[in-house]
């Protein structure tokens, strides 16, 4: 029995509260159980220097955790004077994932920055960030269309992510912290709404996993992501 009482293939309750802040073009408070992340999408005209004159847009991301998002306080990275390796890895993952959701040529020369700030962490902060940021991005793009700055929606479809892992020999979907901290295998999977893989990050923390276990985990992830995408689409209809 999992601590939450969930079945092995069941994701935590996922909520997506849109328009959570008033200034950003897109803003979403996403919750995967007790993991909560504020995701905002900000639009700027123009693109980075390496893309100028190419007629395409850019999507980038920043990620951070509030000092008391975890059990004990962590100093702000700004106070340390630099970002940690984990932070840089996660924000690059978020950006890569969301670029897969958009036709950058159709976007044109706009830059959209996705800021993901973890308010409370209970496992799966990067997967929650990707899921919430995708909805914030969709809202931001709709505002560009409403303002007459885009004729066509560059969004190709939803992108979502979930963690999977092996805990005490059992493959589980959407690990909370108490499961993640003892997992023999920990994996994050990002997919499009039609089940195509954008990224797989998998590590054997204890015991190496087999090819068959990998396929089991990917199947679990796909089922979880299908459920999450349904929630994303429902949120965008409200």
Swiss-Prot record:
Describe the protein's quaternary organization and the partners it interacts with: Homohexameric ring arranged as a trimer of dimers.
**UniProt cross-references to NCBIfam families, sorted A to Z:** RNasePH
Alphabetized SUPFAM superfamilies for the sequence: Ribonuclease PH domain 2-like, Ribosomal protein S5 domain 2-like
- Tell me, what is an example of a GO biological process annotation in this record? tRNA processing
Q: Has keyword Transferase?
A: yes
* GO MF entries: 3'-5'-RNA exonuclease activity; tRNA binding; tRNA nucleotidyltransferase activity
Q: Which family does it belong to?
A: Belongs to the RNase PH family.
Check the record and name the PROSITE patterns matching this protein.
Answer: RIBONUCLEASE_PH
| Entry protein name | Ribonuclease PH
What residues does phosphate bind to? 86, 124-126
Highest taxon, organism lineage: Bacteria
- Listed InterPro entries: ExoRNase_PH_dom1, ExoRNase_PH_dom2, ExoRNase_PH_dom2_sf, PNPase/RNase_PH_dom_sf, Ribosomal_Su5_D2-typ_SF, RNase_PH, RNase_PH_bac-type, RNase_PH_CS
């Amino acid at each position: 029995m999992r601590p939450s009482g969930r079945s092995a293939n069941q994701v935590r309750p996922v909520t997506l509260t849109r328009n959570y802040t008033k200034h950003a073009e897109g803003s979403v408070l996403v919750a995967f159980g007790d993991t909560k992340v504020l995701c905002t999408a900000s639009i700027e005209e123009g693109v980075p220097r390496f893309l100028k004159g190419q007629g395409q847009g850019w999507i980038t991301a920043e990620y951070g955790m509030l000092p008391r998002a975890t059990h004990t306080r962590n100093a702000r990275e700004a106070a340390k004077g630099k970002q940690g390796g984990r932070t840089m890895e996660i924000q690059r993952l978020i950006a890569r994932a969301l670029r897969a959701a958009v036709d950058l040529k159709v976007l044109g020369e706009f830059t959209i920055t996705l800021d993901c700030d973890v308010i409370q962490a209970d496992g799966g902060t990067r997967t929650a960030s990707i899921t919430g940021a995708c909805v914030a991005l969709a809202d931001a793009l709709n505002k560009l269309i409403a303002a007459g700055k885009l004729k066509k929606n560059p969004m190709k479809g939803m992108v979502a992510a979930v963690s999977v892992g092996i805990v005490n020999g059992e493959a589980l979907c959407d690990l909370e912290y108490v499961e993640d901290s003892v997992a023999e295998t920990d994996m994050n999977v990002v997919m499009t709404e039609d089940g195509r893989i954008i990224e797989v990050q998998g590590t054997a923390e204890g015991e190496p996993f087999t090819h068959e276990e990998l396929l089991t985990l990917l199947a679990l992830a796909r089922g979880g992501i299908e459920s999450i995408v349904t929630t994303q689409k429902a949120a965008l209809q409200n």
